[in-house]
Amino acid sequence: DAQETVGQSGRPGVILSLSDGRRIDLSAREGKIGAGEEVVNHPENKQLFYAADQGGEKISRMNRLDVPQGAEYHLVLSDGTRVWMNARSRLVYPVAFGDTREVELEGEAYFEVTRDENRPFIVHAGQVAVKVLGTEFNVNTCRKQKVQTVLVKGSVQVENGGKREVVLRPGELAETVGT
């Protein structure tokens, strides 16, 4: 990204990159964002909310949320899944989920996944894929060449490039090498 959006403090802010290429500094913008997108931002609470999934959207529009060093942000996806993003993290996700619920993470985030038996939620972190139905867990890709997944509630399946799978129980940690 050659373009950098700077917030009111003069430092890079939390940036929402829309599917049409627009970049929005969330620290400087409150209320609804973008035409045709049901997204509401609350910078004072560091929260971004997407409207409930209506299941009608067929074209997958991908957005990206970048959280810089020294910041954190809370995101509610269109299916109701809640994501708490840590500093120096990036999440790529669809505006509305289709037949699958898949996101890509760089950095660290805590997920509270809305249960949906027919559409598993998958977090891709490099070569690692964490697959869930409805649970709470943390994924951290901040360590070089390692992805850590910690399960809080429910169960998750961690795959390393499709080669090896492990199912975690609450309180367990999986550390995968080779991202």
Residue locations for each model-derived region?
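Short acidic/polar, Gly/Pro-enriched loop/turn segments located at secondary-structure boundaries
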Residues: 1-146, 159-178
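Propeptide (latency) domains of metzincin metalloproteases
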Residues: 150-151
